[in-house]
Amino acid sequence: MRILLVNKFIFPKGGAETYTFDVGKMLEEHGHEVQYFGLENEKNTVGNRVGSYVTNMDFSQGIKANLNAPFRIIYSREARKKIRVVLDDFQPDVVHLNNIQYHLTPSIILEINKWRKETKKECKIVYTTHDYQLVCPSHGMFDVNMK
């Protein structure tokens, strides 16, 4: 099987990345072909054969440099376009999503579904939740009383 592992960071950074790399290694050891999609970064240790990655938003650059960031963290045209290049080339049987919030956005799910319909490919989508961010922007799942 061909499996596309998707995570915003595709270099060692934290728990989600460790998990993603361990899953990729295990899948390869069992004879599956694995490629990765995420942010463009010089630290990337894995990737895809077409070199299609999303431009990293550097939030440390201040407000002026990131005026469109509030929109890009909800919906990313660039991420949709870049994942389509990988889908067309790799033709995965499974797309396994991990941390996609802020940089990649759920917009990539729309592109995966569009690609599946257009190609009639029976590609499965799997999503592993590593935190609450997609359902609670503050990550903590606190109520108004911070409980």
Residue map of PLM features:
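N-terminal subdomain of nucleotide-sugar transferases
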Residues: 1-43, 88-90, 108, 112-123
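Short beta-strand segments
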Residues: 7, 36-38, 96-99, 129
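Short, solvent-exposed loop/turn segments at secondary-structure junctions
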Residues: 10-11, 41-44, 101-102, 131-134
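Short aromatic-enriched loop/helix-cap "lid" or pocket-rim segments at secondary-structure transitions
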Residues: 17-18, 45-50, 108-109, 137-142
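Metal-centered catalytic cores of metalloenzymes
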Residues: 21-26, 53-56, 132
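A conserved catalytic-core segment of Leloir-type glycosyltransferases
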Residues: 29-94, 141
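Acceptor-binding helix/loop patch of EC 2.4 sugar-transfer enzymes
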Residues: 60-66, 128-147
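Short N-terminal targeting/anchoring amphipathic segment
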Residues: 84-104, 123-128
